[in-house]
Amino acid sequence: MRGSLQFLCDYFGITRQGYYKHVNRKMEIDILTSSIVLYCNELRKLMPKAGMRELYACCLRKFGVRMVIGRDQCYNIFRANGLCQRVRRVRPKTTNSNHNYYIYPDLLNVTPKFVADTFGSMVVADITYVATCQGWAYLSLLTDAGSRAIVGYALCKTLEAEGPLKALRMAMDFYNRYNVDLNNLIHHSDRGVQYCSNLYVGMLKKHHINISMTQCGDPLHNALAERMNNTIKNGWLFDCTDDSFEQLDKRIADAIYAYNYVRPHQGIQMRTPMEYIRKCSGKVAEVPLVGTGAPAPCREGDPRAKSFCYLMKVYSPKSCTYKRRYIILQNI
């Protein structure tokens, strides 16, 4: 027996308007679901190991008021489409504390505990290792504790102090561009021989940076730096065993750029680190960390910039300024 739509609506006690609204909403949900999957697949090219929280935060920024799907349903979409990632846990050890250098007091793990809640109040340092086809490479990272931004990095083939020194020079140049008073900055690290060496400590004292070091081998006393090692290695450098040292250096530059400008961070209300710095400093975040040494500009012909724009489905034929590049990233 066949009946008219009006008859069926009357029979079930609903209006024709309600029926069509239900049908249209289901179509909208299906279209949004497909868009979310396509968008997250593009994000995976840039952030291969990002968690579901980061993907969901990016979707909220991308779709705005059209994001009518809740968090749990969005997580189910990620699971159903293979967008969840399983992180392999590793615990590298690169600290050599068997030396005769002076170990400075710990200014972080005190009572009451020091909390770095502003940009430019504390920078944490650590070294981790990455496997390449040419052997081990050692990555030195400096992270601003308030904004979670990576402000300095260097990749070296040895564990000598030159790597941390290069990262420190980059970090000081970064802070100077944002008019951060280095006299109020605390540098916190483990008690490894690189950070206690005369060269490294001399550089810190020359710029009147306060020195803080852990007093034991507990990684929790430098937890943010250890966490940063895990984020960069398991988020971007998980499949680089076939890369050369030069290829790894480029991948690290791309990874840190994506971390600072694209990846939302739970500790700063799901903002990106450079968004947080812009909010604190009142200026547009202009200086991406690209390559080694001092931060370099984005020029036409820069393969790092072109590959990044391609991944985000944006092509800029003309030379772009930092501001325009930043806006492009915010509108993906």
Regions found by a protein language model. Give the residues of each.
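RNase H-like polynucleotidyl transferase catalytic core
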Residues: 88-93, 186-191, 205-224, 240-245
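Mobile genetic element proteins and their domesticated derivatives, centered on retroelements
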Residues: 9, 19, 40, 55, ...
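Mobile-element integrase/transposase regions
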Residues: 68-141, 166-170, 174-177, 181-184, ...
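C-terminal domain-tail junction helix/linker
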Residues: 198, 205-209, 231-332
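Acidic/histidine-rich, metal-coordinating catalytic segments
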Residues: 179-197, 215, 222, 269-274
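Double-stranded DNA-binding cores of transcription factors and transposases
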Residues: 1-8, 12
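Basic, flexible linker segments flanking DNA-binding modules
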Residues: 9, 16-116, 218, 272-282
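A short acidic/small-residue loop/turn micro-motif
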Residues: 144-145, 156-162
